[in-house]
Curated annotation (Swiss-Prot):
Main location: cytoplasm
Key word Protein biosynthesis present: yes
Biological function: Responsible for the release of ribosomes from messenger RNA at the termination of protein biosynthesis. May increase the efficiency of translation by recycling ribosomes from one round of translation to another.
Keywords, alphabetical: Cytoplasm, Protein biosynthesis
Protein name from the UniProt record: Ribosome-recycling factor
CDD domains: RRF
Lineage, uppermost ranks: Bacteria, Pseudomonadati, Pseudomonadota, Gammaproteobacteria, Alteromonadales
GO MF annotation: an example: ribosomal large subunit binding
Top-level lineage group: Bacteria
A single GO BP: cytoplasmic translational termination
Amino acid sequence: MINEIKTDAQTRMDKCVESTKTQMAKVRTGRAHPSLLDTIQVPYYGSLTPLKQVASVSIGDARTLNVSVFDRTMIAAVEKAIMSSDLGLNPMSAGATIRIPLPALTEERRKDLIKVVRAEAENGRIAVRNVRRDANSDVKALEKEKECTEDDVRRTEDEVQKFTDAHIKKIDEILAAKEKELMEF
């Protein structure tokens, strides 16, 4: 039972780190990256469809994304969806391809984005700590039911704390890399 609690905590903490990484990938840096457009939804035959299902996104150069739409009739809808997103991008249609130049980030915008990234990292840390709290309370419940000893509880809490420290360190590393990426000119 204790092993199940530890395994569950480890898995949930891994998911917290992945979620934080995904949230940070959505923050636009000055560099082109296809995942920047992952959240964009395009109206397609009456329903909203993720952009990557109606087009392929590739990197043109360091500051340009190319979107190749599979169905030429969708070019205008894809352009409109990109423009109406909160990313501040202005797509330009060039035949079957849509070019999206990424404007350079201003110093003020960079600082705002760093605040956003730090908030995401803190949310990730909080989620990891919540998993730790849940695991520790589950182990204490086992102790109350006399299914494990006090030593088992202490040992398990120490292991869960090590998991927590390792996962928070991963989040901090992701944050440091993203901050470095944002501050590059």
